[in-house]
Amino acid sequence: MAPKPHNTLAAERRKARHYGMQALYQWTMAGAALSDIEAEFRTDYDFSHVDLEYFQALLHGVPAQVDELEAAFEPLLDRKLSELDPIERTLLRMGTFELRERLDVPYKVVIIEAVALAKKFGATDSHKYING
């Protein structure tokens, strides 16, 4: 099978991050089983233009490493981890996971995508906080 064009892969990963952020937010807030969240998302949303492998890597990888991920960015915060907005916390976890585990993705892409998600889902100035 021929590799996908770069712009197609980028768009599919963008959707994977979008759904991944929503699914991880749901996990954070409701504590539902990851398998249930994944099944719900795959039933309720069109995954035909989503990088499913990337979505699954985020959905299962972030919770598996949540303590290590938070330990990596917590010293850099200007407030306690418990005081972070849940969207900000989710995006920082995801971004840290991508920076550590997805070395195939340029760090600038990880930051740009996290900021874009913060603008879409976060509080008024969340994107500034995510951008550092």
Residue ranges and their predicted role:
Residues 1-132:
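N-terminal interaction/assembly modules
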